[in-house]
């Protein structure tokens, strides 16, 4: 039986991946600049600093990289504070874990202020012992550190722990550590679905299948 759950947020608990594809485009629109159609794809594969530099050079924006980063982050923060919705019936697995005394933590690449305002609005904070972010931990989810820290808080061993994720590279890290995985489909990672399926102990196309997950973790 599962003794601890680790949750990704974007594309897993929240239906929020789209803002990361659109934020730079919306920011440029506010500056009166029309962005290229595939800007979201370009930005998705860059760090914030790299993305800001790309925007400054490509669109001849007369602002510092920090000012551009801050502007894009304001767009993203506003989305989390006002709009970011739950992803389908994700609340069902949180309720199940709480009722069965299974501790939960978050492991996310999104910075904590954005997660915190979304969780406050949606009343999700009560479910989690701690929120771990890659920024605060100092390494990405392609490294084991964030999952090791999560398990320390949960008090679990890898084979007692389940990770809920839509991202293939995070699942790959967890699987190599011996952590069980639930793969959740998200349209933002269409191209990675074969890998997500191959890494998942349980794969679901939507949270309508939450009972399938509950059966697996019992």
Give the positions of each predicted feature.
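Conserved phosphate-coupling serine/threonine residues in phosphotransfer and NTP-handling enzymes
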Residues: 12, 108-110, 185
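Conserved SAM-binding loop
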Residues: 13, 104, 163-164
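Short, acidic loop-to-helix structural element flanking the phosphoryl-transfer center
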Residues: 78-106, 116, 144
